[in-house]
């Protein structure tokens, strides 16, 4: 395969797990057999499986808009997001400068943290300990994620009252 200038210049900077993903991932179960046959660390297996699930699952493809990239960043971390974007760059015939810019943008970012904890719900809002705290915390987290990682006390109270 012919590489564009970006991929040529950055090919030697790839780590082992990502390089393996470029070699073994496709629509077959080759990666599963590879994991069975060769001793690959669980961390590297997880990274390769993330890329495979993202690109080769039956789900409709996810667009690389800002909100979706932030969600990937939150759920899979910086390394997972960079792997997903790099895989797209290295397997495409043309270089998408937007993807390179996104990698550079997220390199210096920290994963967002939800400021509300279960202890806060129990202490400040009088919710009894138990399963309900987890359910409400999950609802708050979903609203927080869909609202670009911002949530007001008003929204929290509204969720807790429902």
What residues fall within each predicted segment?
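Charged substrate- and nucleic-acid-binding regions of tRNA-handling and nucleotidyl-transfer enzymes
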Residues: 89-162
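Conserved, hydrophobic alpha-helical core segments of structured domains
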Residues: 1-92
